[in-house]
Regions:
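N-terminal auxiliary segments of SAM/dcSAM-dependent transferases
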Residues: 1-18
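C-terminal alpha-helical "lid/dimerization" subdomain adjacent to the S-adenosyl-L-methionine
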Residues: 14-15, 157-212, 216, 222
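Class I SAM-dependent methyltransferase SAM/SAH-binding core
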Residues: 57-114
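A short glycine-rich, Lys/Arg-flanked "PGG" loop and its adjoining helix->strand segment in the class I
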Residues: 138-153
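Core SAM-dependent methyltransferase catalytic element
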Residues: 219-245
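Hydrophobic beta-strand segment of the Class I
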Residues: 27, 125-126
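A short acidic, Gly/Pro-enriched loop at the edge of an enzyme's catalytic core
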Residues: 113-124
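Conserved alpha-helix/loop element of class I SAM-dependent methyltransferases that forms part
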Residues: 26-29, 35-56, 71
Length: 245
């Protein structure tokens, strides 16, 4: 299915790449405005759930401008950040250098469906607002499994679909009518933020994503809904002893 914001498969990946390149320089500003600053609270919640220990190896997928990667490093992790938008990565590198000139975070341009790291490399994987943008969600979750160490954790912050029909209608109305206005005013690109609702319409609800994770072998899968389900954090663990697959 296609429309002015949403296309499937590789066309979708190219479209998303263009959108993020066009807003990279003002991405942090518009995030603060469109979420009323709440995205910072949601990311801190994810980090608490991640239980990162000093010395652990962490991969922040779809890292964007680097908020989660920088926070993981502050918690003592050895961090890699992966994103397919070089424009977003440039902002992430600048932020990292400004916050900590000696930072050892490595930001890599690459595809979250074909992660350029060996099997069983990372103790912790995080992904903020990235699952919804994958051209093939199942392929992405499989590759996340591959690079996670046995006993490792996956945590994904993503837009959700509230169960309550009234709240869902209010939320979708905000995404449809107000968010593109913010995008046009503050970064000159309404389409980039109109895309959020269109991509969410094609993205599975929280429990469907959780079921996909379980089917692939992730254990202790749970969904933490935030603000009545407008946002969610998926938490999952790779078994300590890798079962036959």
């Amino acid at each position: 299915m296609t429309n002015k914001f949403y296309t499937s498969g590789e066309q979708r990946a190219a479209k998303v790449g263009e959108l993020f390149a066009s807003i990279a320089s003002r991405y942090d500003l518009i995030n603060d405005i469109q979420s009323f600053g709440l995205h910072r609270i949601w990311k801190r919640r994810l980090l608490r759930l991640a239980r990162v220990q000093p010395g652990e190896r962490a991969l922040d997928l779809c890292c964007g401008t680097g908020d989660l990667a920088l926070a993981l490093a502050k918690n003592g992790a050895d961090v890699k950040g992966l994103d397919f938008s070089e424009a977003m990565l440039r902002v992430a590198r600048e932020k990292s250098k400004a916050q900590n000139p000696t930072s050892k975070i490595e930001f890599v341009c690459g595809d979250a469906q074909r992660i350029p790291f060996p099997d069983a490399t990372f103790d912790v994987l995080t992904i903020g607002y990235g699952l919804r943008n994958l051209a093939d969600l199942d392929a992405g979750l499989k590759d996340m499994w591959r690079v996670t160490k046995p006993g490792g954790r996956l945590l994904a912050l993503e837009f959700g679909k509230p169960d309550n029909a009234v709240w869902r209608g209010i939320y979708f109305g905000y995404l449809k009518f107000l968010l593109p206005i913010f995008g046009r005013i503050f970064c000159g690109n309404a389409a980039a933020y109109g895309y959020i609702l269109e991509s969410l319409k094609h993205y599975p609800a929280q429990q469907e994503v959780a079921a996909m994770m379980r089917k692939l072998g992730w254990q202790n899968v749970r969904v933490v809904n935030l603000m009545g389900g407008i946002m969610s954090i998926h938490c999952a663990e790779k078994p300590s002893m890798n079962p036959a697959r």
